Amino acid sequence: MAGHSQFANIKHRKGAQDAKRSKVFTKLRKEIIIAARSGPPTPDLNPRLRAAIASAKAENLPKDKIEAAIKSAQGNAADDSYEEITYEGYGPGSTAIVVHALSNNRNRTAGELRHIFSKHGGKLGEKGSIAYLFDHVGLVVYKAESIESFDALFNLATSLGAIDLEEDGEGEDKVYAIICSVEDFGKVRDGLYAQYSDGELARLSWRPKQRVLVDSPELNTKLMNFLNDLEDTTTYSMLRGTFHLWVSGT
């Protein structure tokens, strides 16, 4: 019986891992489709597509799946008619949250989000109810280990028009985030890519006008559970924020 139970546990864990991997692949595929539709379907001519493909390869999305997603972007299949939608709401502890979603069904996505916010004691808000607490900015992220000189990166970024460069994380998880205006995003991204190749992330994002430290262990746990539920929802490609999400307290 013990052996049978252990085998069942292994199957359960593998099933959970496979399900999580499938969700990640789904998100990556959506991002590739949106990126391919945002410009030329050729990575060399489309920085956003190049970044999406790099992210997909980092997660070991098979090459044939990547190529199929790019090809799908050129078709008219209803299931692949994804659009980018921004939602706003209050999460645990009245933290202001901006969520960026890729969806082919607005009603379904809004319903899923409303359920997640409500489940964690939050509330999905109307358009404009939260966004004023944030600045809409361009964001380019590099792993620190891929940059030889922070000063050289800083000097190049500022010469291209970046307004800030932030550090986050430690060790192999340390990253540099270059912040710029929406208007200068293309110039900053392309200039950085020309010097340092493609980064970990390059897209428009939301930055809080005022940072609030979450120093309550209980609230931190609630926030992490809330964000995990958001990330587990297959209708999202990426959460806006400090390299995935910025939270602005109120």
Swiss-Prot record:
An example Gene Ontology biological process: regulation of DNA-templated transcription
GO cellular component: cytoplasm
One Gene Ontology MF term: DNA binding
A Pfam family recorded for this sequence: TACO1_YebC_N
Positions of region (Disordered): 1-22
Family of the protein in this entry: Belongs to the TACO1 family.
Name of this chain's protein: Probable transcriptional regulatory protein AM694
Species this chain originates from: Anaplasma marginale (strain St. Maries)
